[in-house]
Amino acid sequence: MYAASREASSRSREALRAALTGSDSVAATTGSELFAVVAVLDDQRSLRVALADVSVPGSARAELSERVFGGKVSVATQAVLTTAVAQNWSRTSDMVDTLVLLGQEALLESAANAGRLDAVEDELFRLGRIIADNADLEQALSDRAKPAAAKRELIARLLAGKAEPVTISLAEQVVGRNTTRIGAAFDELSDLAAARRDQIVAHVRAAIALTSQQRERLAASLQRIYGKPVTVHVQVDPSLLSGLVVRIGDDVIDGSAVGRLERLRRELA
């Protein structure tokens, strides 16, 4: 994002914080309604452009949003939306992406208030791995030719009775926006949930499954390095031969046999 959109995003997030009261029901409603608003904006380009048109005063854009969505969403959601559309965004897509992020944060807030954030984070990670490991499922969920409603219905059917309501809502939103980065989108959501708990996420690829003791030791070691609690998400990858690869943000620690062989190859070249 450029500076204008970063400032607009910050002010919109402040509006979200002010709108949420600590009640998981208010947060859940706000998150779901923001997703519904985004669905409308995705479908109606003219409205999307009008609400982000910087040549029109912010107050007029706010009035337009109230005419379109007033009475159809809660007071909290309307307050967030009014603030967001009144800002000057560098790009229309920045406004829509921020509304998506605010919806995600509101739903994660509701999970935190209900004491279910840990479960949601774990489910999002595991769902991302399941999709990444199933080419047919990934294709079905990322197929731009398939209607968004059909993809939302598919993921809801797969998760029914197996996942937290917040996880299902977040998953439906991800697959409904025609992204081709399904696995990465779920990783980002899992990271967002961890950040909500003031933790960082270590994405670990290991040649074999780690025991609970090994995971705990790894998390403790990484916490000493990064100075914050670390959530360890492990994906088994036999192609590494032995050892593991740890990714935290842009940092990569490669302790795998394949990595060591590659470094040796470069040294000998």
Swiss-Prot record:
Its main location: membrane. One of its GO terms (molecular function) is proton-transporting ATP synthase activity, rotational mechanism. Belongs to the ATPase delta chain family. It is found in: Cell membrane. The keyword Ion transport applies. Keywords: ATP synthesis, Cell membrane, CF(1), Hydrogen ion transport, Ion transport, Membrane, Transport. One of its GO terms (cellular component) is plasma membrane. HAMAP family: ATP_synth_delta_bact (MF_01416). Pfam families: OSCP (PF00213). It is a peripheral membrane protein. F-type ATPases have 2 components, F(1) - the catalytic core - and F(0) - the membrane proton channel. F(1) has five subunits: alpha(3), beta(3), gamma(1), delta(1), epsilon(1). F(0) has three main subunits: a(1), b(2) and c(10-14). The alpha and beta chains form an alternating ring which encloses part of the gamma chain. F(1) is attached to F(0) by a central stalk formed by the gamma and epsilon chains, while a peripheral stalk is formed by the delta and b chains. The gene is atpH. Transmembrane segments: none annotated. It comes from Nocardia farcinica (strain IFM 10152). This is ATP synthase subunit delta. F(1)F(0) ATP synthase produces ATP from ADP in the presence of a proton or sodium gradient. F-type ATPases consist of two structural domains, F(1) containing the extramembraneous catalytic core and F(0) containing the membrane proton channel, linked together by a central stalk and a peripheral stalk. During catalysis, ATP synthesis in the catalytic domain of F(1) is coupled via a rotary mechanism of the central stalk subunits to proton translocation.
